[in-house]
């Protein structure tokens, strides 16, 4: 905890030295989460960042605040902060204690026309052969609910449903081997643990899917996967209660 706090303060010091040459009227941080300190007196933070600033707080739904514990939110009270943007509208009320000017940002998504010549798309069509396609897409890790999906696959008729997992993996080598072995043992699975080349290819997989699996574990943030699912009119499975679940219940 202390090491992380020191690293963040050191980064702010370096940033201040870089900004001195520019003397900006306003500094905007595209990911404020990585810039705010976790442990420091507020006067020191104001000294290190003496310019008016704002930014996007990507993960804005945080655990309850406890005074004296490492937390970025008290630094939103800085006299130089002119406002904070968030993606998760349900977290706004909890942040108003620290900053009155909270702005809701849309979670933009690239809706480029689906690629028609993507090799993985052709392979999916060949393997699925008309079955309903359930897809888990994007960065592949166990926070994305892979375990739940794998437990569900044997419970559904394999002649009716086909399962796609595609995206860049952050699993261990053993986890990847286990996942591939599971997929290869069944005729209704296609697992590709490589990065999806671009948004057109990503959208092609969305368009070919019948259901998007997004039941992430303890994920409190927003995801533009909901935007893509809505744009391509695909139903989506999400975890109940948090941001994505509340949006689906409210608008779905």
Regions found by a protein language model. Give the residues of each.
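Short N-terminal targeting/anchoring amphipathic segment
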Residues: 3-8, 15-38, 54
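Conserved donor-binding/catalytic core segment of Leloir-type glycosyltransferases
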Residues: 124-144, 150-153, 163-165
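Nucleotide-activated donor-binding/catalytic signature segment of Leloir-type glycosyltransferases, i.e.
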Residues: 131, 175-200, 204, 208, ...
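Glycosyltransferase donor-sugar binding loop
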Residues: 137, 162-177, 195
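Acidic donor-binding loop of glycosyltransferase active sites
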Residues: 204-221
């Amino acid at each position: 905890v202390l090491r992380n706090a020191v690293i963040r303060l050191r980064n702010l010091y370096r940033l201040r030295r870089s900004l001195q040459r520019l003397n900006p009227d306003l500094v905007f941080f595209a990911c404020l989460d990585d810039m705010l300190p976790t442990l420091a007196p507020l006067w020191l933070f104001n000294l290190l960042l003496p310019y008016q600033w704002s930014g996007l707080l990507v993960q804005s739904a945080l655990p309850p605040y406890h005074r004296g514990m490492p937390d970025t939110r008290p630094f939103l009270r800085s006299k130089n902060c002119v406002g904070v943007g968030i993606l998760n509208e349900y977290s706004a009320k909890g942040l108003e204690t620290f900053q009155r000017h909270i702005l809701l940002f849309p979670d933009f998504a690239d809706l480029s026309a689906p690629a028609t010549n993507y090799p993985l798309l052709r392979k999916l069509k060949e393997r699925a052969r008309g079955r309903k396609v359930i897809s888990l897409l994007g960065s592949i890790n166990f926070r994305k609910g892979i375990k739940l999906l794998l437990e569900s696959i044997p419970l559904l008729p394999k002649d009716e449903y086909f399962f796609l997992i595609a995206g860049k993996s952050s699993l261990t080598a053993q986890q990847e081997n286990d996942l591939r072995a599971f997929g290869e043992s069944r005729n209704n699975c296609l697992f590709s643990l490589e990065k999806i080349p671009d948004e057109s290819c990503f959208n092609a997989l969305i368009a070919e899917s019948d259901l998007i699996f997004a039941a992430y574990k303890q994920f409190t943030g927003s995801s533009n996967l909901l935007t893509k699912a809505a744009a391509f009119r695909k139903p989506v499975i999400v975890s109940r209660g948090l941001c994505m679940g509340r949006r689906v219940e409210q608008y779905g």
